[in-house]
Regions:
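Extended alpha-helical scaffolding segments used for macromolecular assembly and cargo binding
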Residues: 1, 71-145, 149-152, 156
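C-terminal boundary/linker of central alpha/beta nucleotide-binding cores
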Residues: 1-65, 72-77
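Amphipathic alpha-helical segments of tetratricopeptide repeats
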Residues: 104-105, 140-147, 180-187, 224-229, ...
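Short coil/turn linkers that connect adjacent helices within long alpha-helical scaffolds
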Residues: 109-110, 148-152, 187-191, 229-233, ...
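Conserved alpha-helical positions within TPR/SEL1-like repeat arrays
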Residues: 120-127, 155-170, 194-209, 220, ...
Length: 350
């Protein structure tokens, strides 16, 4: 038991991490096991209840226990679970990313498919926080592993190209990478439909941003029709895709179509999840934005209010998140030609 705990501790950030969080990652019911290790002197602890391994102990543990993907699967699964909880932010994300970085550097890769999946699940969460250092490490690691043709799947190769496109600054290069990613997948199946839909959405987004509305429309519509075809409209990925498509339709002077897509999505989220979750709020906020763009203030107000009611409930302990949202919407007003600015908070709270 203790050796297993030690073996996972090799990946802790050198600045340490909260004992409670670490115990949760390892699914330990209590802190007893960690406290025992602190008592033996193997694990260092500070006043703030953070734990870390002494570098010398770390070195010995690495060579003695050889932590591997198979052996440390609970830790890897826990980190992936956090990265896959859409819309849920954790305040220790830097420590999480440092731990992932140490895993990449130090773990024995004895189960390659499981390891590749770990990298692929962590990358989008790093992207949320624009954690470039970690994103670059993951891309490099995937490149190294996927060089031999017999390792990995078409989907792995498509994801690598998609990740590279995410970090690519030149639009034409990013577009080429997304097209190459799509070319990796010959047959669309239930297993890869979500990925292919995402790739079309990303490509559509790039075309939209670079002034190719016809191509943007083609790929955005393909992306949504795949979600529809494979009954995936209720999953988290569909939300940004449909929201972006609705905004695109509004830019193309078709706001009614955009609004009807979003209302359909609202219904689906309500049916599969609830009407007080973060995803529902995001859709309400997008509806508010479109009504703003079409100068329909009463409707805009209704939808923003609905969104904020949910944000204020979910982020009750994080007033700065709510404040940041207010700021974000406040900036929308002048951009869209309304200079209501300061009255916004008043407008929404009435």
């Amino acid at each position: 038991e203790e050796i297993d705990g030690m073996c996972n501790m090799c990946f802790l950030p050198s600045t340490g991490i909260s004992a409670r969080i670490f115990a949760k990652w390892l699914e330990l019911p209590t802190l007893n096991e960690i406290n025992d290790l602190i008592e033996t002197g193997f694990v260092q602890t500070t006043k703030r209840r953070t734990i870390s391994l002494h570098p010398m102990i770390q070195e010995i543990t690495l060579s003695e226990t050889k932590p591997s993907v198979t052996r440390c699967h609970i830790l890897l699964d826990s980190l992936q679970k956090i990265c896959l909880m859409h819309g849920i932010e954790v305040d220790y994300y830097k420590k999480l990313f440092q731990t992932a970085g140490n895993i990449i550097e130090l773990i024995e890769k004895d189960d390659i498919p499981k390891y590749l999946l770990f990298l692929e699940n962590v990358f989008p969460y790093m992207d949320n926080y624009n954690y470039q250092k970690g994103m670059k490490e993951i891309i490099q690691e995937l490149k190294n592993f996927l060089k031999p043709k017999d390792i990995g799947t078409d989907s792995d190769r498509a994801l690598l190209l998609d990740f590279q496109a995410t970090l690519e600054i030149k639009p034409e290069k990013a577009i080429k990478l997304e097209k190459d990613a799509l070319a990796q997948i010959e047959n669309i199946t239930a297993d890869n439909a979500r990925l292919v839909s995402n790739l079309h959405a990303n490509l559509g987004g790039l075309y939209r941003m670079n002034g190719h509305p016809d191509l943007a429309r083609e790929h955005m519509e393909k992306s949504i029709s795949l979600l529809d075809q494979f009954n995936l409209l209720h999953i988290n990925d569909s939300i940004p895709q449909i929201a972006n498509y609705a905004m695109f339709l509004t830019e193309q002077q078709e706001p009614e179509r955009g609004i009807s897509e979003l209302q359909k999505l609202s219904g689906i989220i309500k049916e599969y999840h609830s009407d007080d979750c973060l995803d529902y709020a995001k859709v309400q906020e997008t509806l508010g934005t479109i009504y703003l763009m079409t100068a329909n203030l009463p409707q805009a107000k209704t939808h923003f209010k609905r969104a904020f009611k949910i944000y204020e409930k979910i982020w009750a302990d994080e007033p700065e998140m709510i404040e940041a949202k207010y700021q974000e919407i406040q900036e929308l007003y002048p951009q869209i030609g309304f200079c209501i600015g300061k009255n916004l908070s008043g407008l929404l709270t009435k």
